[in-house]
Amino acid sequence: QHDPLKLTEKDDRLYGLGSTDMKGFFAVIYAALEPLLRQELKFKQPLIILATADEESSMNGARTLAKLGKPKARYAVIGEPTGLKPINMHKSIMMETIRIQGQSGHSSNPALGKNALEAMHEVISALLNFTQQLQADYQNPHFAVDIPTMNLGVIHGGDNPNRICGHCELEFDVRLLPGMANDSIRESISKLVKPIASKYQTKISLTSLFPGVEAFENQ
């Protein structure tokens, strides 16, 4: 209904990409500080407003600042929309790619090729079953979504109905609960797809779109 890249006001609400997330926080903090700045008050300690890039995915901005050890602060307010409820944990985020390389050929004789789409069909079934098992084994009632999740977000494969699909790619994200490790899940997925590669005589590779962020809990 609204252009996400343009702030729109309607019925006392503001609509736009990030308006209730990080961009909303910047508007709030600026509004809160403006009266103090008008009074030309001298702060006893510096007050820093920090914005980081790639907050929704790779966290590259925050990673760089953490690596540099800057800035130093005694206290911090994180501008996430939590309804003023203290939050001491977050899920992990992984974004992964599975690539299947088969062998193309003419559809008149499918046996002459190695169909990457058929192999991917079995990979997807294995991933869904794996996710169901994770959700049965792990729950945390402190999260609104109290289970680990996997979203199959992007798939590309084939270029013509009369050709055997020689290449297929799947991109997905995984969000784990505290106590679960990203690398452990990657290893489990890698073991899942190996027998599928052998069955369909294809090559299957698993790579990360970015390093990922581990789940966190602060006692």
Predicted feature locations:
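Structural signature of FAD isoalloxazine-binding scaffolds in flavoprotein oxidoreductases
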Residues: 1, 78, 167
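Short active-site-adjacent structural elements
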Residues: 1, 86, 217
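Soluble metallo-hydrolase cores and metallopeptidase-like ectodomains found primarily
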Residues: 1-8
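Conserved hydrophobic/aromatic pocket- or pore-lining residues that grip, position, or stack substrates
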Residues: 7, 49, 172
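Fold-level recognition of mixed alpha/beta catalytic cores in primary-metabolism enzymes, strongest
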Residues: 10-14, 19-129, 146
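Metal-dependent amide/peptide-bond hydrolase catalytic core
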Residues: 95-219
